[in-house]
Amino acid sequence: MKATALFLAASALAAVSAGAYDGYGYDPRPASSYNKTISGAAHIGYDSRYAYKDVVASSVLNRSGVFNIGGELNLNLARDWKQEIGAEYMAFCDGLLSDKDAFDASWKAVKELFPNLSFRGGYELNYGGLPGYLSKHMGKAPHSLAQSVTAGLAYDDPGHGYFGSLDVQYGFYGMIGWRVDLNAGKRWSGLIHEKVDLELSAGTGYSSSYWGPGVAGFDQVNIKLAAPVRVTGVDSSRGFRVIPFIQLDWAGNTRSEIRRYAGMNAIEDFRIRVGVEAVYRF
C-alpha cells in the first residue's frame, strides 16, 4: 500500500512537471534566480484554523486560529548545492495548543536537477503544535517535541505557471513513522489584474505508523485558492506580496485511528480555512 501511494505520488508530480505551455501569463524566470549567493523571505500571517501539513487540528486544540511569523534564508552550500534555513513561530488564539508556544525549524540541502525541478533533503524540528503536543500527550516523548528527516522534489515553472512538490518524511523522535505529502497546482499571472495572480492547487498526505503503530492510509485531501497581490517587485521571486487564501480540508481514512491512539478528538473531519499572509522576498 505504501509503495503504491509513493508510486502514484511520484507519477502525479511528473505529470505536473510535463504540463504543456498554455501561452497565458508567460513570466519567465530570471536567469540568475538560482545562482544568487544569498536570498530568502520573511512572512507574517493569520490562518483561521491551525493545521500541520494540512491536517487540521480539532476545535479542542484550536478554535479561533493562529498567527505566524517566520523566515527563510538561502545560502550557497557546496559547488552547485544550496542550503535553506527556515524558522517559524506560531501564536495560538485559544485551545489546548495555546498553553505552549510553538516553534518550527528546518534545514535543507537543495540541488537543481533540471530547470525548475530541484531535490531537497534535510531535517525538521517541531516544538509544540500538533506533532509536539501529541508526542508528549501520547507518551512518545518527555517533551512537546518531534523531529524528522525529509527528502523530496519541488517543481516551480514561473513561466508556464505549473508548480508542485513531493515530500517524504521520516519521524525519528516523538512522532515516529513515515509521511508522504503531494501538492500540485497552476498559477495564472495577471489574470485578475496585472499585479494580481490566481493560484489553484490540490494536495494529499499519506502516512504509515506516524500517528500510531499500524496506522496507515491517507491523512487529508485539500483544495486551495489563493490570490497573491504584488505590491513591489517585478515577479514572484522578489519584492513584497500580500496573499489572501481560502482552503478546503478533508480528513482521510486514518482519522478514526488517529483519534483512538490520541485518546481524544485531535483532528477535524472537514474544515474551511481562510487567511492572509504578507511575504517579502529578496
Give each language-model segment a name.
Residues 80, 140-231:
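Detector for outer-membrane/organellar transmembrane beta-barrel domains
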Residues 39-49, 70-72, 84-90, 120-126, ...:
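Transmembrane beta-strands of outer-membrane beta-barrel proteins
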Residues 43, 70-72, 104-110, 150-154, ...:
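Outer-membrane beta-barrel architecture
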Residues 49-65, 86-183, 254-272:
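Outer-membrane pore/translocation modules
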Residues 200, 223-282:
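Predominantly the C-terminal beta-signal and adjacent terminal strand-loop region
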Residues 1-41:
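Cleavable N-terminal export/targeting peptides
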Residues 40-46, 68, 80-81, 106-107, ...:
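Residue-level detection of beta-strand scaffold positions
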Residues 22-23, 27-39, 76-84, 96-97, ...:
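Short loop/turn motifs that connect adjacent beta-strands in outer-membrane beta-barrel proteins
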